[in-house]
Amino acid sequence: MRQPHPTRRSLVAAGAALALPGTVLAQAKAPLVGPLAPNPQAFRQAMEQFIGKARPQADGLLLDVPVLADNPSGVPVKVKITLPLTEQDWCEEIIVLAELNPSPLACRLQFTAAAGTAEASVRLRLAQSQTVHALARMKSGKVL
């Protein structure tokens, strides 16, 4: 029996099929550039603007973000103040920052004393795997 000889067309198709996965991987690992590039200066500026001269405390604010999200266009984020809220000291504002997003200030939430609680659930669009930060400012000037 005669063995079929590979044609030029089948060799080119096989070569393209072998080269394609490497190209896709290289594109996936390429750093974001242009308008999608991370903006560390804007991140630092947003942090400094919110904190001011206060020293942030390590406790009192709970941030719940999944380690891996199914959909980067809608990552669920929950933020909650765990300190007791009173009429003299309540949470005025919470911000959520996505460190490697082109616009790092992802969410700004403002509360009044009448809210009774300071918690929220939002969905963020994240440009890539990154650290998400949250800061809260209390009426007394404390930053969490």
Report residues per predicted region.
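Short acidic/polar inter-strand loop motif in beta-rich domains
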Residues: 139-144
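N-terminal secretory signal peptides and thylakoid transit peptides that target proteins
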Residues: 1-19
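Short edge beta-strand/loop segments characteristic of extracellular beta-sandwich folds
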Residues: 76-84
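Exposed aromatic-hydrophobic patches
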Residues: 119-124
